[in-house]
UniProtKB/Swiss-Prot annotation:
This is Prefoldin subunit beta. Transmembrane segments: none annotated. The gene is pfdB. Molecular chaperone capable of stabilizing a range of proteins. Seems to fulfill an ATP-independent, HSP70-like function in archaeal de novo protein folding. One of its GO terms (molecular function) is protein folding chaperone.
Length: 117
């Protein structure tokens, strides 16, 4: 049936499929960022339960480094903020792509409407 479709509609269908793949990739990224956010929050909660003079270690690449509770809290809060901004960015991209997806879908349906009759 695609051989019968005009090139413009074939192109729109290809764009639609590409946008759908991008939306799926963004959903995966969003899920990963949300998981990292959850981990950071759990770590902050645990740090909150520790005494102020507690010995804290953190991973830096392949190393485990001794650090202060305050420094760990600061780094985790910075990480949470960065992840939150990333999540907002992903959500905006998702909204734009979803809007474009719906728009293309309507254009294709309108173009195919008279052919279906």
């Amino acid at each position: 049936m695609t051989a019968e479709l005009p090139p413009q509609i074939q192109n729109q269908i290809a764009q639609l499929q590409q946008i759908q793949q991008q939306i799926q990739a963004l959903a995966m990224q969003k899920s990963q960022v949300e998981a990292m956010q959850k981990e950071s929050k759990m770590a902050l909660d645990e740090l909150g339960r520790l005494a102020d003079d507690a010995v804290v270690y953190r991973n830096v690449g392949e190393l485990v480094i001794k650090t202060s509770k305050e420094e760990s809290i600061t780094k985790l809060k910075d990480r949470e903020e960065t992840l939150s901004l990333r999540l907002q960015s992903i959500s905006r991209q998702e909204e734009r792509l979803t809007s474009r997806f719906k728009q293309l879908q309507e254009q294709i349906q309108q173009a195919l409407g008279p052919r279906a009759q």
